[in-house]
Design a protein with these regions (language model features):
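Glycine-rich ATP-binding loops of the HATPase_c
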Residues: 137-147
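Short beta-strand/loop element within the Bergerat-fold HATPase_c
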Residues: 78-90
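Short beta-to-alpha transition helix within the HATPase_c
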Residues: 17-35
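Conserved short strand/loop->alpha-helix "switch" segment adjacent to the catalytic nucleotide/phosphoryl-transfer site
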Residues: 13, 17, 39-59, 117
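Glycine-rich/acidic phosphate-handling loop/turn and adjacent ATP-lid/helix
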Residues: 90-123, 156
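Single conserved hydrophobic/aromatic residue that forms the stacking wall/gate
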Residues: 1-5, 9-10
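Conserved ATP-binding N-box helix of the HATPase_c
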Residues: 53-76
Length: 162
C-alpha cells in the first residue's frame, strides 16, 4: 500500500514483482502527488500475467489517467485514488475508485463522455478499457456514487483469448 500526497514522494517504489505494472503504478503515484491526491494501492499479482503487455499497459494507464484527471475537479482535501489489482487463477480483477465532481460528469445515451474542451477528440479511455475487457472475455462496470467514480473489470486470462 502506498500513501502519496506530500512533498516526500518515493520514486521507483516497489508495489509488485511485475516490472511493467510497477513502472505504471510508480508513474501515476508521482503524477497524482503533483495534484496532492492520496493514492492507495492494493496489489496482489504474480511476476507475470497471461495478458499481452500492451493490453495491460493500455488498461492501467487509461484507468489511472482518468482517475488523476477526475481528482483534479475536486478540492485538494478530497482527492483520493484507490486501485485494487488482484489475480487469482486465470482471472485478473481491477477496481479503481477516484473522487470526482459528479456535476462535471456528462452522460449521453448511457455512456460517459469527456468533459474536456474539444470532447470529440477525447473520451477514448473508457472505449479502450471496454475493448480490452471484451478481448479477455471480461466485464466492465462503471459507477458513480457518493462522490466517487469507480471502474471495475474482471478479465479471463486463459490461452483462448484472441
Amino acid at each position: 500500500e502506498c500513501l502519496v500526497g506530500s512533498e516526500m514522494c518515493i520514486r521507483d517504489s516497489t508495489y509488485t514483482a511485475n516490472a511493467l505494472v510497477n513502472s505504471i503504478l510508480s508513474e501515476f503515484a508521482e503524477r497524482a502527488s503533483r495534484y496532492k491526491a492520496i493514492v492507495e494501492y492494493s496489489i496482489v499479482i504474480g511476476r507475470s500475467l497471461n495478458m499481452e503487455d500492451i493490453d495491460l499497459c493500455r488498461m492501467l494507464t487509461n484507468i489511472l489517467e482518468n482517475a488523476v484527471e477526475g481528482c483534479q475537479k475536486v478540492s485538494e482535501e478530497q482527492r483520493i485514488i484507490r486501485l485494487n489489482l488482484h489475480s487469482k487463477g486465470n482471472f485478473l480483477f481491477i477496481k479503481c475508485e477516484n473522487s470526482c465532481n459528479e456535476d462535471n460528469l456528462r452522460i449521453t445515451n448511457g455512456k460517459y463522455k469527456s468533459s474536456k474542451k474539444n470532447s470529440d477528440k477525447h473520451g477514448y479511455g473508457l472505449k479502450i478499457i471496454n475493448g480490452i475487457a471484451e478481448k479477455y472475455n471480461g466485464i466492465l462496470n462503471v459507477q458513480v456514487r457518493g462522490g466517487f467514480f469507480a471502474v471495475t473489470t474482471t478479465l479471463c486470462l486463459d490461452e483462448n483469448n484472441d
